[in-house]
Amino acid sequence: MESCKYMLRSYPIIRPYIKEVNALFSMSPEELRKRNERRFLEIFQRAYDKSPFYHKLYTEAGIKKEDIKCLDDIKKLPVITKDMVRSHADEMLTVPRWKVIVANTSGTTGTPLRVYEDWSSIWRNQAYAYVTRKREGFTYGQPLVSLRGNLDKRDMMLKVHASNTLFF
């Protein structure tokens, strides 16, 4: 099972996302701002259109889709609390439930929080980790210790031999 999980997160799979992340480093501040604004608007519009939770939250706050035109408009959006995420995680989804994987936060600041991830977000996160480590001089295959709070409760630690990584 560990080899399958590793393979699904390996370089050949995440290569397109690595290119996307690397491109961020060559952008000017203005290009980066425009990119971030475009992504914010895409995410907001998807949440408004596809998520029952967000649509209701924004409607009750008097926010229409056309009210959010730029990144500065993020100030208009209601704050979302951990309690809201705990109570409405399924309603927050913008894709069918079968398309996501359940994950949990570590609960470092209190109770663990159930969240959902789709494969593209997992691959994008892997790409960020890959690029960051590579920029700091890390070569894959070198021993690595990863301190993360998302191990199964039965595991105190996990050694992934394919990546030479020890997870705590």
Please annotate each region the language model reported:
Residues 1-104, 111-126, 130-141, 150:
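Nucleotide 5′-phosphate-binding alpha/beta core
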Residues 106-111, 160-164:
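Acidic/polar active-site rim loop that often engages polyanionic ligands
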Residues 131, 143-168:
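AMP-binding/adenylate-forming
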